[in-house]
């Protein structure tokens, strides 16, 4: 009664009753089916009440607007007059119900914060381009220049800017010109900084991710070309040129700027320009704007269907369809927009193979079933329709069906759908139904009306399709979010169509009756009927629209009555006959399409990891069958891919180059082995042997075997020589009777009676008798010197030539060096320049991208078999027409006997013929679920470097091509080219579901049935479809109208089942593979040459830096093959305090610090990494050098989670202790002393023996 709610005073606290309240009486629970009926009735009454309110609005005044809502401007005096009249009747008119119930729908939504900001900034810096009085696009002023899209025709709505002479840049689809000086102060600023996130434009938020700008679908359209995209500071980051719909979002074609201020254009595939160009349609040789047709369906249905059929291939068909179903002057609710198209159609009856008892003509025949999403939903296409009442008006949760020519309706909750168990019906739209069903091998739909149960079943394997790497059967409550494909629960236009056409004639025997012994035909009210009779040798064929008797015919079997209808479409089903003559066809949008979404996937229990020496043991406990994939981060990945269903243990080897495993849906984990082993390389022989046996088992066994062999040979040779010498010494005395052997000879058993020649006499003898031996003896000392030199060189750590050359070349003003191509590992060096202090340079690659040049060959996806309604000719023959559609097959079958729900279709039994046609087209879900075949070519390399030169740091992106320089703080840096042209991508690659596969796909036009590429499209939206599916038509069954066929299974589906793991899990060198664009990141392969051009301003004079007068280096702790496991302490005395660069010229050690702070006297601690057991390196501090050396021990941890930050040039060699024991075994100082004693004894024996004989 009142337009406002009264305010009542607060009620006092209720009186507390000391007596207990009686128990609440029990009532039986309501029947849930009854509750659903009540809810459906309530919803219907609400809809009816709402329509009545819209049809007869109250005469009272409009609702009183709140203070926050801005009053709308009144247009026209007539509107003001009505407003005044309403004020006069305010007292007597009924209250406005919308005010009481709240404003549920705002006609003018207030712009958001982003839109308001952009509108404010655009007011003086963006100018519309007018064409024939309409806004065709926009021009904006950025950085003192005018930019307008080249494809936008028209004149800028500003006299000054319109008079400017522009230059064209066709590469970027832009025209530009310098604006006058007085306008430059009020222009946009541009920026190349585009971190991932959200930006703003005229229609709200724009998402920037992976180098692409996207907006929600439906935001932005023709006429928005030239609008700027702004960041939070009001700077222009891009200019919009067009867009393309990609599922639930629209990708924008933009022009932006890179780091160098150079214009860059990004255009997604199949992008269309967003200039407001009017699309023209055709009607009876007269063109008209597709959005403004001269007729509409509600007024002229038959003519409207003919108009749509004539423009079915026109690019503006969607605009024409939208305008044709909404007549001018009629406005409907937004919810009706989803259902209005299907009022052009009607349900039909079709043959179902499996009804309740055998086959039948069912009102709910199932045409197709699809379940390709990852959410467990099923999309059905049936002969019945949903969301419409029998008259074609909107009625939610309702199914209408054709029951022998009469369209009836039933609430949707009375329709059941089940597989192995009942399904949950989500929604329906047109011929399509969306439901969630449990697993099963068939799907059945049924309903009961007037004690009659109608059902239809089709064989189809319904199963849950998990996404990710764990084969779960039900969506989990918790887990990780992963990209997936789900069926959209709405009927928005997503670019897929289903083909319609005018229905053929339907036999209806109920229209034929006998009246007074004569055949009488009564067509339904408002429709026509075709009557064909064979009576007394007379053939009758006549179209009637009212009851008519045929005096020549006395039996009902002599006549056939066919229903005719030319103002409704039906689905182009193979279960319906085709209309005679040229069929008017059309197309409507398919609802509930696959769309990109996010699914919750389970996470398998984390594996229990046990580390060993160069090994990892994984103890796995999967909840579902889970994939385990591993690879080595080396040149040969040696990947493994295994599905694990039971608890198990897997052991893997890990190298110093790295190893990666991916368990289920968990992120990848990487491990690196360290050079650890038991024993002590600096201990006793058995400790040394144990240490090296664990590190190098084969080399240790080989070395010990050689040593044992040498010792054995030496002992055997010594024994043999001793025996031989003894026998030679004793023989002369044995041959002499009563000979007495001297005591010393008896002890040593060896003596020589001859006098030794001098060295000169020996050389004289060789010169006179054997000069070759003379020269050989002279060359022996030289050979020994060469051998000793080579042994010393092999046993000592010598700096390689390239390192020496690099250190020598570092003194140049233009500095050149080479760093490893490994992300995250710092490379430090210094520049020595005469008269200046060493300048430290530190370079850390943060990200390295390898982007190949790709060429899209074709796109492949699931195919759909299209079948035309068969053309049936009674009592006659016919021929196939030429075929033009992909893989189209046409065949004529004679002797058919078609039968419909209304009776036999033809009079003849065997003279009838049927033309069956079938062809191949892409699936409705091809836009969301498809694979793209690319050919990859030469790759470009980009490196994101964190560079520090002296005290100046910057982060910049460098093109590693050896040509493109980068300038920062006066330093000019040129990188590349990469030392190797390696790429993880083969010549042929396939992109599917955000992953890349190396796959040798067939060329375009050479696809084979059942294999990848059986259908091929140049782009997802193109019409040049190639198909080869081995489609063969079969003879139709007698008594039925259908088009049977056989066909090879989908090659795309088979490839998805058989495909190997993607490059994300199998690429060598630890590459990380991404898409949009296709690229490989952080591949640890090769090296990057760097050339610096350093200005004088960055150098410091030597006189301004400290000078060390004394320095001593001590290794406090040293662990080799570990991440900065060495600690060196340098005690020094400096001339003054200051900052000095530190560097190791050789590759023996890698320093963590690039510079240190020095006092006049003290010590400094430096951390380093080394792979040497006995590191000995020269440490440069400022201009002074100090030598650091010591012993290193193996690391304690077998496996670590990060790579080693030291040079791999010098691996851990054999320790000095081991060399000492080895040389002691084979020789050394003790052996030399023994040999000396033996020689002294021999000399003494010789002297004594010679004296005895004399």
Curated annotation (Swiss-Prot):
Record-annotated active site: 151 (charge relay system), 173 (charge relay system), 225 (charge relay system)
Positions of the UniProt region annotated as Interaction with spike glycoprotein E2: 167-172, 259-263
Annotated region (Functions as an uncleaved signal peptide for the precursor of protein E3/E2), positions in chain: 275-286
This protein's record includes keyword Ribonucleoprotein: no
Gene Ontology CC: one annotated term: virion membrane
Entry's free-text remark on domains: Structural polyprotein: As soon as the capsid protein has been autocleaved, an internal uncleaved signal peptide directs the remaining polyprotein to the endoplasmic reticulum.
Bilayer-crossing regions: 703-723, 769-789, 791-811, 1225-1245
Region (Disordered): 48-118
One GO molecular-function entry: structural molecule activity
Site residues, Involved in dimerization of the capsid protein: 199, 232
Full protein name: Structural polyprotein
Region of interest (Transient transmembrane before p62-6K protein processing), residue spans: 735-754
A Gene Ontology BP annotation from the UniProt entry: fusion of virus membrane with host endosome membrane
Residue ranges of the region described as Necessary for nucleocapsid assembly and virus assembly: 1-33
Residue segments, region Binding to the viral RNA: 90-126
Organism: Venezuelan equine encephalitis virus (strain Everglades Fe3-7c)
Disulphide connectivity of cysteines: 281-290, 352-456, 355-360, 423-437, 484-599, 533-559, 535-553, 729-750, 861-926, 874-906, 875-908, 880-890, 1071-1083, 1113-1188, 1118-1192, 1140-1182
Site (Cleavage): 274-275, 333-334, 756-757, 812-813
Other remarks in the entry: Belongs to the New World alphaviruses that can cause fatal encephalitis. Structural polyprotein: Translated from a subgenomic RNA synthesized during togavirus replication.
Catalytic activity as recorded in UniProt: Autocatalytic release of the core protein from the N-terminus of the togavirus structural polyprotein by hydrolysis of a -Trp-|-Ser- bond
Keyword ATP-binding set for record: no
Biased composition (Basic residues): 76-91, 103-117
Interaction with the capsid protein as annotated region, ranges: 724-728
């Amino acid at each position: 009664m009142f337009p406002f709610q009264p305010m009542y005073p607060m009620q006092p606290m209720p009186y507390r009753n000391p007596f207990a309240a009686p128990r609440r009486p029990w009532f039986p629970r309501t029947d849930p089916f009854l509750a659903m009926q009540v809810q459906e009735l309530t919803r219907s009454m609400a809809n009816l009440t709402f329509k009545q309110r819209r049809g007869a609005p109250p005469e009272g005044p409009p609702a009183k607007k709140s203070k926050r809502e801005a009053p709308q401007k009144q247009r026209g005096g007539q509107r003001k007059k009505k407003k005044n009249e309403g004020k006069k009747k305010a007292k007597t008119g009924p209250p406005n119900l919308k005010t009481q119930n709240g404003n549920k729908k705002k006609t003018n939504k207030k712009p958001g914060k982003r839109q308001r900001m952009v509108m404010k900034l655009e007011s003086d810096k963006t100018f519309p381009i007018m064409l024939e009085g309409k806004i065709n696009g926009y021009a904006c002023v950025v950085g003192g220049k005018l930019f307008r899209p080249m494809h936008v025709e028209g004149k800028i709505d500003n006299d000054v800017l319109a008079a400017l002479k522009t230059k064209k840049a066709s590469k970027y689809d832009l025209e530009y010109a310098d604006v006058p000086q007085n306008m430059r102060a009020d222009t946009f600023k541009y920026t190349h900084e585009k971190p991932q996130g959200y930006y703003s434009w005229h229609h709200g938020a724009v998402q920037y991710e992976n180098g692409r700008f996207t907006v929600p679908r439906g935001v932005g359209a023709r006429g928005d070309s030239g609008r700027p995209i702004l960041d939070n500071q009001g700077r222009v980051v891009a200019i919009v040129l067009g867009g393309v719909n990609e599922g639930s979002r629209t990708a924008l074609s933009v022009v932006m700027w890179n780091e160098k201020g150079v214009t860059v254009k990004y255009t997604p595939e199949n992008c269309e320009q967003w200039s407001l160009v009017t699309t023209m349609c055709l009607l009876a040789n007269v063109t008209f704007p597709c959005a403004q047709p001269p007729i509409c369906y509600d007024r002229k249905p038959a003519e409207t269907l003919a108009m749509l059929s004539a423009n079915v291939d026109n690019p503006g068909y969607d605009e024409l369809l939208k305008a044709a179903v909404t007549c001018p002057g009629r406005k409907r609710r937004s919810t009706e927009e989803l259902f209005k198209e299907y009022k052009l159609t009607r349900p039909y009856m079709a043959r179902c193979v499996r009804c309740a008892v055998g086959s039948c003509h069912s009102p709910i025949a199932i045409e197709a079933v699809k379940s390709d999403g990852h959410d467990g939903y099923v999309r059905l296409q049936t002969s019945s329709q949903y969301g419409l009442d029998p008259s074609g008006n909107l009625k939610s949760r309702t199914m209408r069906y054709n029951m022998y020519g009469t369209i009836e309706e039933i609430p949707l909750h009375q329709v059941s759908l089940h597989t192995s168990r009942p399904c949950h019906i989500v929604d329906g739209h047109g011929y399509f139904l969306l439901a969630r069903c449990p697993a099963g091998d068939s799907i059945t739909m049924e309903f009961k009306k007037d004690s009659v149960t109608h059902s239809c079943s089709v064989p189809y394997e319904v199963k849950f399709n998990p996404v990710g790497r764990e084969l779960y059967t039900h969506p989990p409550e918790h887990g990780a979010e992963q990209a997936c494909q789900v069926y959209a629960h709405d009927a928005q236009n997503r670019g897929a169509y289903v083909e319609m056409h005018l229905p053929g004639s339907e036999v209806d025997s109920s229209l034929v009756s006998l009246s007074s012994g004569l055949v009488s035909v009564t067509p339904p009210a408002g429709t026509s009927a075709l009557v064909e009779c064979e009576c007394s040798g007379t053939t009758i064929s006549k179209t009637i629209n009212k009851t008519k008797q045929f005096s020549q015919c006395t039996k009902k079997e002599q006549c056939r009555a066919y229903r005719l209808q030319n103002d409704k479409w039906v689905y182009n089903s193979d279960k319906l006959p085709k209309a005679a003559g040229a069929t008017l066809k059309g197309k409507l949008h398919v609802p509930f399409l696959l769309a990109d979404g996010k699914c919750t996937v389970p996470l398998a229990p984390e594996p229990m990891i046990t580390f060993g020496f160069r090994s990892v043991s994984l103890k796995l406990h999967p909840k579902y069958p889970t994939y385990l994939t591993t690879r080595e981060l080396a040149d040969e990945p040696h990947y493994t891919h295994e599905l694990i269903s039971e608890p198990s243990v897997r052991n893997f080897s890990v190298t110093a180059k790295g190893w990666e495993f991916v368990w289920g849906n968990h992120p990848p984990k990487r491990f690196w082995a360290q050079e650890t082993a038991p024993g002590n390389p600096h201990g006793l022989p058995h400790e040394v042997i144990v240490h090296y046996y664990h590190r190098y088992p084969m080399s240790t066994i080989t070395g010990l075997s050689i040593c044992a062999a040498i010792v054995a040979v030496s002992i055997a040779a010594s024994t043999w020589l001793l025996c031989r010498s003894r026998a030679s010494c004793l023989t002369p005395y044995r041959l002499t009777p009563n000979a007495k052997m001297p005591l010393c000879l008896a002890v040593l058993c060896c003596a020589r009676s001859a006098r030794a020649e001098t060295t000169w006499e020996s050389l004289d003898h060789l010169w006179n008798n054997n000069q070759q031996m003379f020269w050989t003896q002279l060359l022996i000392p030289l050979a020994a010197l060469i051998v000793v030199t080579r042994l010393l060189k092999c046993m000592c750590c010598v700096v390689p030539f390239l390192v020496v050359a690099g250190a020598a070349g570092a003194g140049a003003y233009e500095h050149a060096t080479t760093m490893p191509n490994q992300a995250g590992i710092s490379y430090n060096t210094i520049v020595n320049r005469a008269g200046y202090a060493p300048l430290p340079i530190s370079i850390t690659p943060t990200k390295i991208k390898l982007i190949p040049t790709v060429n899209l060959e074709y796109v492949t996806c699931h195919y759909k078999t299209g079948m035309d309604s068969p053309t049936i000719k009674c009592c006659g023959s016919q021929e196939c027409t030429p075929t033009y559609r992909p893989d189209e097959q046409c065949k004529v079958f004679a002797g058919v006997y078609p039968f419909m729900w209304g009776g036999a279709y033809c009079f003849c039994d065997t003279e009838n013929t049927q033309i069956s046609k079938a062809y191949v087209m892409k699936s409705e879900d091809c836009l969301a679920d498809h694979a793209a075949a690319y050919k990859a070519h030469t790759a470009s390399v980009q490196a994101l470097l964190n560079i520090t030169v002296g005290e100046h740091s910057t982060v910049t992106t460098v093109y590693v091509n050896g040509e493109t320089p980068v300038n920062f703080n006066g330093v000019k840096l040129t990188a590349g080219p990469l030392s190797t042209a390696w790429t993880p991508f083969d010549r042929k690659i396939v992109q599917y579901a955000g992953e890349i596969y190396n796959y040798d796909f067939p060329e375009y036009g050479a696809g084979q049935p059942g294999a990848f590429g059986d259908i091929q499209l140049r782009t997802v939206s193109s019409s040049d479809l190639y198909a080869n599916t081995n489609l063969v038509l079969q003879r139709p069954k007698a008594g039925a109208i259908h088009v049977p066929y056989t066909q090879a299974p989908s090659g795309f589906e088979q490839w998805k089942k058989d495909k190997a793991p993607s490059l994300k899990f199998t690429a060598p060198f630890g590459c990380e593979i991404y898409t949009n664009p296709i690229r490989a990141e952080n591949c640890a392969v090769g090296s990057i040459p760097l050339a610096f051009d350093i200005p004088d301003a960055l150098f410091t004079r030597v006189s301004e830096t400290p000078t060390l007068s004394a320095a001593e280096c001590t290794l406090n702790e040293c662990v080799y093959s570990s991440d900065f496991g060495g600690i060196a302490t340098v005690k020094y005395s400096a001339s003054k305090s200051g900052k000095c660069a530190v560097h190791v010229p050789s590759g023996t050690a890698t320093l963590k610090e690039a510079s240190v702070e020095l006092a006049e006297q003290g010590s400094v601690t430096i951390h380093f990494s080394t792979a040497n057991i006995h590191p000995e390196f020269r440490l440069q501090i400022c201009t002074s050098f100090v030598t650091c050396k010591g012993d290193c021990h193996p690391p304690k941890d077998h496996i670590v989670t990060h790579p080693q930050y030291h040079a791999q040039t010098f691996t851990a060699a054999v320790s000095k202790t081991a060399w000492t024991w080895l040389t002691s075994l084979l020789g050394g100082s003790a052996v030399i002393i023994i040999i000396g004693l033996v020689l002294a004894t021999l000399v003494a024996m010789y002297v004594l023996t010679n004296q005895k004989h004399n």
